[in-house]
Amino acid sequence: MTVDALLPLLSEDRAFYDNSGGGITLFGGECLLQADFCAALLKACKAAGLRTAVDTCGDVPRAAFDKVMPYTDRFLYDLKAIDEDVHIAATGRSNRRILENLRYIDACGKAFEVRYPFVPDYNADQAEKIAAFVKTLSRCVGVKVLPYHNLAGSKYAALGMKNTLPAALPTAAEVAAAQKLFE
């Protein structure tokens, strides 16, 4: 699909965006792996007067951010851990670039919301560290604690794969305590 084909479809909901204060959010997998297309689409959306956001895990080259930054009003930024060893244990990848890119977004003056997936037995101990890190940034407009759920378990079974996801779900009290750290 092309930008020219997408823009009329996205513009159909303009009244909803205007009434809700919303706009176009690019997400799915890691949309910034397609930074050139994202930049072209965001540029067209801005030219059409639409508000824009990008949902990202931040583990992409800085050049991807440079391409979309001029056309992005807000970033939704996943932050799983501050401690590199915790991040590597869960994802197999370092979080250095993720943290550097979030600092970069902040330095560029762009608004962002941190989204913290809260997973017992993985990163529950990271909430205070994430809160302390976020407080060093000036453009954060909020933090959402996203409680872990095990809905993917049935998908593993259907695919005949071993489910390696944690079994424990966070309690409402644990989630509330984590969210309180960000107030």
Question: What do the PLM-derived regions correspond to, one by one?
Answer:
Residues 1-5:
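FAD-binding FR-type
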Residues 7, 11-151, 155-157:
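Conserved AdoMet/S-adenosylmethionine-binding subsite of the radical SAM
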Residues 141, 157-180:
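A structural motif corresponding to the C-terminal lobe/cap of the Radical SAM core domain
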